[in-house]
Amino acid sequence: MGQAMVAGKPGSEGIWWNPASIAEQDNRELAIHHSQTVAGVGDALTFVLPTASYGTAALSLNILNIGEQDVTDVNGDVVGHILPRDVVFAGTYAANITHRLTAGLNYKIVQIRVDCSGECSTVGAEVRSSRAVDVGAQYDVEFGAPLTFGAAIRNMGGKVNSRATNQRDPLPTQVELGAMYRLKFIDHYVKDTELRAAGSFINSRSFGGKSVRFGTDVTYQGKVHLRAGYVGHDRRAGTSAALGLGLQSGGFAFDIARTFGGLPADTGQSPVYVSLRYLF
């Protein structure tokens, strides 16, 4: 949906867009999310545990592998390997504040790691760590209505500490506002089909500037999803289109999406996102 998910409820993936999105989740969920982007290869594992009276909790581990690099000696021979990775441990809690309003919070431990194997005397391993918080909320205009507003602030208060140089660099804070609306007119023309449209505005400040995102999701019998979206321009990349497909059978749900255009495609690697979720 063009990453316009701040007002959506996509399950465990929504933790990274808006932690409030899991507040009304009914089923426990175990999920694996995989991505291949210009930044690297990402893998996330999440477990979601809803309760009847105390809201919903989740635990997540997200690893971004930026890519192995060779260490060479003065003769150009490979003597070691550098493995830079970004690692995030996240604990999430979300709950209903009223019958219309939900809120959620992520508490994250962030590590920027550079591990090394072999001869690493000229490079050295390094771990920079920090803690940060994401907060979010979602609001239904009327209880049970098809219009939902969402807001989230990500990476609040985080500064990366370097053990080697004692530098403190702020994490890229993002502010996102958006809405999602179910278009009911399609009910008169197609049975068992729902159409939702979403849009959001993001301000990444010095990290990427401002951008907009739009998307649609067509759902058939609650089991087949066809998605399309648009990711607006910011300072890090140009505009891009997005297409996605989702399938659900019993407790298993599979989703795949791809974006086209912008910086990643121009460098020859269009981003691909794959999710496998088990609801029980």
Residue ranges and their predicted role:
Residues 1-280:
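Subset of outer-membrane beta-barrel
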